[in-house]
Amino acid sequence: MAWRLTVPELQDQLQCPICLEVFKEPLMLQCGHSYCKDCLDNLSQHLDSELCCPVCRQSVDCSSSPPNVSLARVIDALRLPGDIEPTVCVHHRNPLSLFCEKDQEFICGLCGLLGSHQHHRVTPVSTVYSRMKEELAGRISELKEEHRNVEEHIGKLVNNRTRIINESDVFSWVIRREFQELHHLVDEEKARCLEGLEGHTRGLVASLDMQLEQAQGTQERLAQAEQVLEQFGNESHHEFIRFHSVASRAEVQQARPLEGVFSPISFKPALHQADIKLTVWKRLFRKVLPAPASLKLDPATAHPLLELSKGNTVVHCGLLAQRRASQPERFDYSTCVLASKGFSWGRHYWEVVVGSKSDWRLGVIKGTASRKGKLNKSPEHGVWLIGLKEGRVYEAFGCPRLPLPVAGHPHRIGVYLHYEQGELTFFDADRPDDLRTLYTFQADFQGKLYPILDTCWHERGSNSLPMVLPPPSGPGHFTLGQV
């Protein structure tokens, strides 16, 4: 027996009289007509009286309407696999050769001229396909560029990680070399410093590993997105256009490009290489340095008002000028005096007792700096000083002067000179086991440097207390020595 109905014509016979769509969960009324379950539910909810069949107008009871199982099976059998839409217009039986840009659906020529799409922007399917193909190619190109950027970022992270580890290895060697000179007295401190360094390095490497893992994850997602999008390019025209926008958006959203730019992590250890020993000295109550001869003051440089005593280790400003030869090395205006020993290399530490003086200055001066007239107290003139003014203001003499936030009133000032490193550091040395930094000058030292003391004017006796270069003391105190 031959079939007289085509599939589209059969679909017309399988439309619900209410929604005019193919039946969904069809129910059969007592009169024999069928309707979608949702259509009957909606219709019965809006009626105050009993329901009548929309086709034959017979009164029916929806609550006793059974499912039309046979009709449902016929509909399921006619439905295409994967629920793929047809390529022929269901209304006009013409090929779906156009695409409505507003409604985002395929239409035929008559739909665009006479149907609901006649005032919409329509484009040939081939044109839409070409346009979307170009968009896909552009997105793939962008993903490839992002992929290259991520690869470059990963390379920088790997190099940064390697550099951190190498610098850590170098610094670890420096620590071991320094601690070998301290022998058994610093074994415990060496273990502590190495542990701190390793922890610092682990933290930096862990941070870089985390960034590396994130970047590699992004790289993998970009590669997957790139592969999925490239596969879309092999689909048929209709399949490609139908799934392009949704699939492309989903894949690209899951593969967001790496945010930010590469920012390298610098290896900055808590200890400066040159200060390892100094830090250990603080912890070991300054017992590790030998005690060479202490500094002495040079009378030939002292201002005429200055009086030296106790083997040229104590100086104070007197009321009357002393009769002294006016020689080039002597200060004739500023109340200053130099130590007899200067330094042109190495690392050195000494202390000065300032007691309760209300005004004082100390530091180092170039041997060639002028000592005649008012002293130019600035690094530009070869003078590096800190001091106390009127018992209240601590300051570093730079350009301009810099007030120093000093806690309390230190009676003993430590001075640490690292000639090659170009560092001059001042400490509050009141407590033997705790050197608190007051200020550090950074400079390119040239020529011999001499410790300098400036007692400042006696102010009619109110500032007449002495400044003292303390002699070598027992194991509880640091003494002058070359590091």
Curated annotation (Swiss-Prot):
The gene is Trim50. It is found in: Cytoplasm. Zn(2+) binds at residues 89, 92, 111, 117. Changing residue 372 to R: Complete loss of acetylation. Expressed in the stomach. GO terms for biological process: regulation of establishment of protein localization. A zinc finger (B box-type) spans 84-125. The modification N6-acetyllysine is found at residue 372. This is E3 ubiquitin-protein ligase TRIM50. Belongs to the TRIM/RBCC family. Disruption phenotype: TRIM50-deficient mice show a significantly prolonged survival time when LPS-challenged when compared with wild-type mice. TRIM50 deficiency also significantly ameliorates NLRP3-mediated inflammation and tissue damage in vivo. It comes from Mus musculus (Mouse). Keywords: Acetylation, Coiled coil, Cytoplasm, Metal-binding, Transferase, Ubl conjugation, Ubl conjugation pathway, Zinc, Zinc-finger. Its EC number is 2.3.2.27. A zinc finger (RING-type) spans 16-57. Can form dimers and trimers. Interacts with several E2 ubiquitin-conjugating enzymes, including UBE2L6, UBE2E1, UBE2E3. No interaction with UBE2H. Interacts with BECN1. Interacts with SQSTM1. Interacts with NLRP3. One of its GO terms (cellular component) is cytoplasm. InterPro entries: B30.2/SPRY, B30.2/SPRY_sf, Butyrophylin_SPRY, ConA-like_dom_sf, PRY, SPRY_dom, TRIM/RBCC, Znf-RING_euk. E3 ubiquitin-protein ligase that ubiquitinates Beclin-1/BECN1 in a 'Lys-63'-dependent manner enhancing its binding to ULK1. In turn, promotes starvation-induced autophagy activation. Also interacts with p62/SQSTM1 protein and thereby induces the formation and the autophagy clearance of aggresome-associated polyubiquitinated proteins through HDAC6 interaction. Also promotes NLRP3 inflammasome activation by directly inducing NLRP3 oligomerization independent of its E3 ligase function. It catalyses: S-ubiquitinyl-[E2 ubiquitin-conjugating enzyme]-L-cysteine + [acceptor protein]-L-lysine = [E2 ubiquitin-conjugating enzyme]-L-cysteine + N(6)-ubiquitinyl-[acceptor protein]-L-lysine. PROSITE patterns: B302_SPRY, ZF_BBOX, ZF_RING_1, ZF_RING_2.
